[in-house]
Amino acid sequence: GDFQHTPGDYVYINCREISIIEWYPFNIFSETAEGDLILHISSNDKWSKKLYDKTLSVIEKDNSLDWEIRLDGPYGGSSKAILETQHAILVGAGFGISRFAPILQDISLQLGKNLNSTPLKKIDLHWIIEDHSYFEWFTKLLHRMKDESGFFNYHIYFIDKTPDAFNEKLMYMSTNATDKKIDVSIIDNLWDAASFHLPSWNEKLSESKDRNVDLNSKVFYSGPRKHLKPLKKSCKRLNIPLITKKF
């Protein structure tokens, strides 16, 4: 139809079965060939947890939903600013990582096609994980984007876990609520990119900048305010532009 959106956009949704008056913003993850929107909804607050619980209870009974969802948007945040940056340093923390997922998915689809027509030459992603709500669905995308060319690199920081909490290799687990199936697969190379503490931004950004000295770098941040101050300080010290949320 007339619904136009770009990667990184979000919509507000209202579900009368949950609340008549409340509207909540959710990131657009992708759109199917039939025109259905796939949104990233995390059950980490009262409204979205209610939505999650009610959806599961309905599916368990008769495997169908007949709810009317009202939608307002889209609003952006598009991927344009990232695609127009030669060296994009993405920093996602907590729920903020979901902002980058559709953008990275879009870039992933363009890899090998017409990405050469954009200024973007290199992506460094820094992912700060405070809980594992977003780990399952994001790891496969990282695995798919990692290639030999060095175009895309990622660094993962578990700040709620110790190395002892993991086996030697990290597992990807996907759950299909409708079929009640669980698929588990091993992802080898995530382990090499993982740390168990907050990064030293002076060190990480200096390394990143030195490796890409011929490219103009920008940092894009999405996540809680508590992680922003040290990042902002390092960006200022190293003279790297910092863009938060509005991109």
Q: Which positions does each model-derived feature cover?
A:
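FAD-binding FR-type
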Residues: 2-90, 105, 175, 246
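Short amphipathic alpha-helical interaction elements and helix-loop-helix interfaces
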Residues: 17, 34, 57, 106-113, ...
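Histidine-anchored nucleotide/phosphate-binding helix
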Residues: 28, 97-116, 140-142
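Reductase modules of NAD(P)H-dependent flavoproteins
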Residues: 39, 44-48, 53-58, 64, ...
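Short boundary motifs at domain starts and secondary-structure transition points
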Residues: 79-82, 114-115, 209-211
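A short, charged/proline- and glycine-enriched loop
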Residues: 83-88, 118-122, 215-216
